[in-house]
Amino acid sequence: MVLGSRVLTYNGEIYNYAGLRAQLPGPWRSTSDTEVLLHLLAREGTAGLSKVVGMFAFAIWEGDARRLILARDRLGIKPLYYRILPDGLAFASELKALLVLDKPEIDASAVRDYLFHGYVPAPKSIYRGICKLPAGHTLAWQDGRVRIERYWEPSADIKTRSEEETLYELDALLREVIPAHTLADVPVGVFLSGGIDSALTASYLHAPHTYSLGFDAKERSELAGARAAAKHLGTVHTEMTAQAADFEQALDAIPRIFDEPFADSAAWSNYLIAQFARREVTVALSGEGGDEVFCGYPRYWSSVGTRSNVLNRALARGLPPLSRLGASMQRHAYTGLPAFAAALGGMPPVQIDQLLARDWRESGYDYLWFYRQFWREGEDALVQLRWLDLHTSLAEGLLTKVDRTSMAHSLEVRPPLLDHRLVEFMLSVDPALLVDRRRRRGKLLERRLMQPRLPPGHLERPKSGFGLPVHRWLKSQPRVLHRAVARLRERGVLARSVGPEFRRAWSLLVLDRWFAAFG
C-alpha cells in the first residue's frame, strides 16, 4: 500500500486497528488494518508500534529519506528473513524466497545450533548471509548502513497484589484479549486439546467451533479429554483421528515448509490439525504460549537453578565435565544456565562434537551463546527461566512451528494467550501465585479460573497437547533412521553412526530430510 512517498508491505493482523484509526486523521481509502498501520507509521514512526496490538512482520520504504525499515512483532509470531546485498537489502517472510538470488553456503555453526536447540536461533539462519530479524526488533537500512534495535522489552518488576485481586484483573484482561483475537470477516475456530490452555481460550468465547486431533496410538490420544471439555463448554466440536499413513505423508512436506531444519516432533501434529480445521475455517485460535505465560513447564517448579543440582543435571544430559566446558561456560556452571539448557532436551554438546564430521564441528564452540544473552543473573530461578523461555524457545521454536504448519494450509492461527498485554501482566505477578514448588504444580491462577468451567477431575489430567507418538513410529521403522544416517555420512556431515535414542534420532532424520529438500 502507498501513502505519499511511503510504501508498506505487511503480513499479519492488527486487532486494535479500529481504535487506532479513530485516533488518526486519515484521509482513508479503505477499511483495512494495513492502511491504519501505514498512517500510524507515517505519523509516529516505529515509536507508534507501542500502540499496536497484534501479530505482524512488515517492511516500509520511506522514499523521501531513501530508508527501508523492517519490523517483527513483539513475541515473534510472524517470521521475517533478510539478506544484505552489495547494493541493497532483500527481505521475505520465507527463507526460500531469498534463495532465488543465489544459493549461499550452509552455515556449519547453524547446524551445530540446530542439533543443540532443535531449531536455528535468530539472528542466524541455516545459510550464511541470510538472517532472521529477532522478535520485538526493527531494522533500518539507509545508504548501505544497517541498524537493528529492540523496540519492546517487557518489565519483570513484580507488583504486590493479593491472589483475589490478581484473579479479578486476569479474568478482566482475558475477557478483553481473547474475543479481540476473533476479529475477522470469516468464521473463527479454536484448536482444542485435552489440556487447560486451549480450554481456557475456548471458554471465553460463545459456542465456538472447536477442532481436536487424536491418533491411533491410544496411549497418546487426547480426544477423550478434549471431547469432555468441549461438551462442558458448549462448543461445536469436530474430531479427527490420524493414522500412521497421515504422518508418513506429511513427513516429506515438513522440511519444505520450515525452510530450515526444525526438530520439534509436534510440528507434524500441528500440520495435521491445521489441515483438518482448514476444511471449515480460515482463522483459528490456539492455546500456544500458555505454558510460558501461566508457568506450566515442570522446570518452573523444579530446582534446576540451585547449586546442588546443576552439575548432576547437566552431566546426566551428557554435558562435558567442567574441565572441558571452556572458560565461558565455566563462569556460568553454577548459575543454572547449563542445567536449564540440558533440561530443554536438545542434543548434548559433547555428543554433537563426537557425532559431526571434522568440517562441521568447532573446538570450544559456545553452544550457550543464544541463551547467554538473555540470562539474568541474581534473579529468582522462576523469573530467570520464564525470561529465558520468552526470549528464546518461544519465538524460535513454538511460534515457528505454529506459523509454518498452519500457513502451509492457508490457515491463520492466532495465539491470544501471547497478547503482549497479557504477557506483561503475568510477568508482574508474584511467583508464589504461579507455582507450588512443594506440590510440584504450576498454572495455579489458570487452574483457579478454570475450576468451575471444566468437568470434575479435568484439571488433574496429565499435561497434554496435540502430541504425536513419534517414538513408537520410529521404533517400528528402523530402516528409515538407518538410511537417513547413511545419507548424512555420505554427505560428509556425520562422522559415525548413532543408536536409536529418540531425540538424537529424530533430529538427524529431520536434518536428512532437509538436505534432501534444500541441500
Predicted features along the sequence, with ranges:
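Donor nucleotide-sugar recognition loop
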Residues: 261-265
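Short, glycine-/Ser/Thr-/acidic-enriched flexible segments
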Residues: 13-14, 63-65, 75, 96, ...
